[in-house]
Amino acid sequence: MFKYLILLFGTLCFSQELVFNNLFDSTLNSKIACYRIPSIINSTNGTLIAAIDERNNSCGDLKWNRDINIVLRKSYDDGKTWTKIEKIIDYPLGESASDPSMIVDRQTGDVFLFYNYMNLDIAKDVYRFM
């Protein structure tokens, strides 16, 4: 009987419907080739923050793309709704940022965003971590 109670409990826990949202859809903007390398965190106040590469002109990686920005969206209601896309890292053409990674300091509530940077006009093949 104990086995069946565990099975029933597990069934009840996972009976909620899964909902999938496409937060970053490149087909909605002809200037964007693709979105890649997502990062998502849950802040100490419950805000979900999703960041991602916005790759313009091509889907090429940092070394091959002169225009990669980092954008984000936030949700204040557990992912039911999301803010509009906000561009947070946007260097001049020839300088790009990619591969966002976020961490939360649970003591202070601060959110840190790290990313790769490359200036393709001055130092191609030199990655800097910001």
Enumerate the predicted regions with their spans.
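Asp-box/BNR beta-propeller blade signature and adjacent active/binding-site loops
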Residues: 16-130
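Sec-dependent N-terminal signal peptides
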Residues: 2-13
